[in-house]
Amino acid sequence: MNEKTILVAVTDIFFYTKVRDALMAKGYKIERARTQQDIAEKASSTTLSAFIVDMNDEKLNAFQALETLKADTSMKTIPILAFANHEEVDTFHRAKALGVTKIVSRNEFSSRLKDLVEEVAGTHV
């Protein structure tokens, strides 16, 4: 089996565990990023099928992470699935402007995680 790796930038351990368990059940390998440095190092050293980022994570600067990924030619094609609080319209617009493949509300992310990852990761060869 060709294992697909997904980098997950979520510092909340309970939310991360939910994401990890759901995706590992689908056969994905999960790498966790807890810091900006983690994101840059893991994204550049691993062939990623997708990058998942919590735009509201207070311990990570999600916008900086997106800028870092998109600035590097070897990483700028990685599909990105982002999620944020639904009322933060500016966050949605800014994330899209920075090249996020898909951004959804936290509720939609939680309820449709597997489908969303398949949709986003399926765009990456």
Language model segments and positions:
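Acidic, metal-coordinating helix/loop segments flanking the phosphotransfer/catalytic sites
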Residues: 35-50
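Two-component/phosphorelay signaling modules centered on CheY-like receiver
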Residues: 13-31
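Conserved phosphotransfer microenvironments
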Residues: 53-69
